[in-house]
Structures are given as structure tokens and as C-alpha cells.
A protein has these predicted regions:
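Short aromatic-glycine-(Arg/Gly/Cys) micro-motifs in beta-strand/loop hairpins
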Residues: 1-16
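Residue-level signal for short segments within beta-strands and strand-turn junctions
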Residues: 7-10, 22, 140-142
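A short, exposed loop/beta-hairpin motif centered on an aromatic-Gly-Thr core
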Residues: 13-28
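Short, mixed-charge low-complexity intrinsically disordered segments
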Residues: 14, 34-143
Length: 143
């Protein structure tokens, strides 16, 4: 069986493979493909987890702001303008914080870049298929 020195420069690995037989090359590529898809899935899941955590935090801030509303109305009814202004300001700050948290980068990345992530998966699949085709061509030449 013939062997070849193969070099690899992948988007996440930057490594020299070494010497492999054609069968070893194919197995390596299959493993590399699986690792690439696994890494992409990890990134998507990480983004989803961050998004969920941020949504929970934003809901807590909104809930805190809603708790202040009856106190604010009571202060307005009692014509306690100083207390009303403080509560109103605090409530608005909480709502702004909730809005910032809710629409922060990690929570919107999945929505904005969903097509990029899907294209990434497609690119990995295409890349894998190209290498399988190269493998088939090399095998044909040798035979």
C-alpha cells in the first residue's frame, strides 16, 4: 500500500497530519468532518444558552420594574412628587437595562447570523465531499 505525506490547514486546527495511507486519509477526513460539525453545533448551543440566560435576566429586570409601578402610582396619588420622580427614574432605568440585556450581541447573534451558521454547516459538508472526491480521484489514478 502506498503512503503519502499529508498536510492540513483547517479553519480551526492548523496542524500537519503526517504520513497516512489512503485509507487512513479517508478515516482522518471523516473524523475531521465530524469534529467540525461538532464544533459548529457547540457554537450554536453556546449562543442559545447565552440567549436563554439573557432572556431570563431581562425578564427579572422587567418584573422588578413592574413591582415599582403600584408604588409609583401611590406616590403620584399622594402628591409626593419627590418619591414619584425617584420611583419613575428607577423603573425607567430597570426597563432600559432589561432592553439592553435582551438585545445585546449574544442574544441577537443567532437571529442575525442564523443563515451564516447554516451556510457554515453547508460549507463543511461541501468541503468534506470535495475531499472525498479528491480521495476517489487519487485512488482511481493509482489503480
Amino acid at each position: 500500500m502506498e503512503v503519502y505525506v499529508l498536510f492540513d490547514n483547517t479553519w480551526y486546527d492548523n496542524s500537519i497530519i503526517g504520513i497516512y495511507s489512503l485509507d487512513g486519509y479517508k478515516t482522518y477526513r471523516e473524523n475531521l468532518f465530524a469534529k467540525a460539525v461538532e464544533k459548529l453545533n457547540f457554537i450554536v448551543n453556546d449562543i442559545l444558552n447565552r440567549k436563554n440566560a439573557q432572556e431570563i435576566l431581562a425578564k427579572e429586570k422587567i418584573h422588578e420594574a413592574e413591582k415599582l409601578l403600584p408604588l409609583e402610582k401611590e406616590a403620584k396619588f399622594n402628591k409626593d412628587t419627590e418619591k414619584f420622580k425617584q420611583l419613575n427614574k428607577k423603573r425607567k432605568i430597570l426597563l432600559k437595562e432589561a432592553n439592553k440585556i435582551k438585545y445585546n450581541y449574544p442574544s441577537t447573534i443567532l437571529h442575525k447570523h442564523q443563515s451564516i451558521l447554516e451556510a457554515g454547516k453547508d460549507a463543511i459538508i461541501d468541503w468534506y465531499m470535495d475531499y472525498n472526491n479528491i480521495f476517489a480521484d487519487i485512488q482511481t489514478i493509482i489503480e
